[in-house]
Design a protein with these regions (language model features):
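N-terminal leader/linker segments that precede catalytic domains of diphosphate-processing enzymes
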Residues: 1-120, 125-219
Length: 219
């Protein structure tokens, strides 16, 4: 068995604002010629060497990188102290490129969004439930961390409420499987996480990625 690719530190910042009908988040469409091309994502990217000077821990580097990436990709300057780390995503060992990605939530700063037209080609503000619906309708493409984040945010009416709900970042160390021809990603509390037996009973923490994606979680 070949060794898994090394984990590369990275970060993402979800910029949210309080709209008339609940939280709205800033989403960006990646250049179709790049990795994850055409996907709708949140601002973010890998940790650069200068980011590591901000502290001794990876999460501190990621916070600095998120501020830098948001400025580069959107023109918005995020106050580091306003950011709450709410999740940490680790890809499966079979992934060709593995980014150890910290997700932060912050109130969107005032100002006009200006995308760089290099890595990012388009932006939109969307309610999480609307973005999820557009994915199911085939209008936009999402990756699982983005989908799960949107699903989580759909349960809140304000950014502050979402931030206050965070006790500590939740770790999503991802494994993959299939139910017939349907891809499934799962995390530590799922009964199939170790065994791979996706049809077995027991606790669930998985995303079933059929035509309509379905999140199953039993806490």
């Amino acid at each position: 068995m070949t060794d898994a690719p090394p984990l590369v530190p990275a970060s993402t910042v979800v910029l949210g604002r309080d709209g008339e009908d609940g939280v709205e988040v800033l989403m960006l469409r990646r250049n179709s010629k790049l990795a994850f091309g055409g996907m709708w994502v949140f601002p973010g990217g890998r940790v650069d060497e200068p980011d590591r000077r901000s502290g001794d821990r990876e999460v501190e580097w990621a916070r600095t990188a998120a501020v830098r990436e948001a400025a580069e990709e959107t023109g918005l300057v995020v106050e580091p102290s306003s950011m709450v780390a709410f999740s940490h995503w680790i890809p499966p060992e079979i992934a060709p490129r593995r980014f150890s990605t910290w997700f932060f939530l912050a109130p969107a700063p005032l100002g006009e969004v200006v995308v760089d037209m290099g890595e990012i080609h388009e932006h939109m503000w969307a309610r999480p439930v609307d973005a999820l619906g557009r994915r199911d309708a085939g209008e936009i493409e999402l990756v699982p961390p983005t989908w799960v984040t949107l699903h989580w945010l759909s349960g809140f009416t304000t950014v502050d409420q979402a931030q206050r709900s965070v006790v500590e970042p939740e770790v999503y160390a991802t494994r993959v499987g299939r139910l017939d021809e349907t891809p499934v990603v799962m995390w530590g509390r799922d009964s199939a996480y170790e065994s791979g037996r996706l049809r077995a009973g027991g606790p669930r923490h998985r995303l079933v990625m059929g035509d309509v994606w379905r999140y199953e979680r039993s806490d």
